[in-house]
Amino acid sequence: MSGHSKWATTKHKKAANDAKRGKEFAKLIKNIEVAARTGGGDPSANPTLDDMIKKAKKASVPNDNIERARKRGSGEEAGGADWETVTYEGYGNGGVAILIECLTDNRNRAATDVRTAMNKNGGNMADAGSVAYMFNRKGVVQLPKEGNTEDDILMAVLDAGAEEVNDLGQNFEVVSAAGDLSAVRDALKEAGLEYDSAEPDYRADVKVQLDASGARKIFHLIDALEDSDDVQNVYTNMDLSDEVLAELDN
C-alpha cells in the first residue's frame, strides 16, 4: 500500500495571487454552506462541515466569513443560495481527459463558462459519460509529514478500508474508496493523527504522459476553467515524469 508520486493527484493547485485567492475563498465558503445544509450546522456532529471549516481556516479565510457561511447553510441566517453540483466532461491538448466539477446556482451560466474556457484554450467538450468512465471516485486524506510516519498511518488505516498510503514528498496521502472516507478519517482521529484535509477526489485509471510543452497547455486550460466562480475542481488524467516536473519548475 505504499507508493511515491509527486503528481499523485492531478487536480491542479492554483497560484496564490490576490485574484485567485479571492476566488479560492469563495469556493471554500460555498463548500461550507453546502456541508452545513446537507449535514447540519454543528461541526462536532458533521465531520464534513468540520473538515471544510478547517480547510478554510488553513487557507486564511476570515472567521467571520466562515461563520456566516455556516449559518446560511444551516438556515440560521438568510441568504443561502440553492447550490447544485454539475459535472462536465471534455478533452484537452494531447487527448488528456478532463472532468470539471461545478457548484452553481445557475446551471446555464456554468455551462457557458466551461464551454467558453474549453473552446478558447484548446479543449473540446465531450458527451456525458464519454470521459467519466476513465475516473474512479475516491476518498483522499492528506496528512503533514511533521509528526507522522508512514508506518503509523498504515497501522491506523489498515482495517478502515484504505487502499494506498502515498508519500508525496512534503506530505502523505491515504486513498480509499469514496464510501470508506469517513471510516479512514475516524481511524486517523482515533489514532491521534492530525490530517490536513479529507475529501472525495477523482483518480484516473489510465494516465496520459505529457512533455513540458503539453503540460503548460493543460495548466493554461485549467487556469481558464478555474477563473469561473462556478468551477470548484478540475481533474485530469495527465501524468508528468520527474524530468518534466523539474523542467516546469525552472
Curated annotation (Swiss-Prot):
It is found in: Cytoplasm. GO terms for cellular component: cytosol. Residues 1-22 are annotated as: Disordered. It holds the Pfam family Transcrip_reg. InterPro entries: Integrase-like_N, TACO1_YebC-like_2nd/3rd_dom, TACO1_YebC_N, Transcrip_reg_TACO1-like, Transcrip_reg_TACO1-like_dom3, YebC-like. GO terms for biological process: regulation of DNA-templated transcription. One of its GO terms (molecular function) is DNA binding. The keyword Transcription applies. Its main location: cytoplasm. Keywords: Cytoplasm, DNA-binding, Transcription, Transcription regulation. The keyword DNA-binding applies. NCBIfam families: PRK00110.1, PRK12378.1, YebC/PmpR family DNA-binding transcriptional regulator. Belongs to the TACO1 family. PANTHER family: TRANSCRIPTIONAL REGULATORY PROTEIN YEBC-RELATED, TRANSLATIONAL ACTIVATOR OF CYTOCHROME C OXIDASE 1. This is Probable transcriptional regulatory protein ckrop_1032.
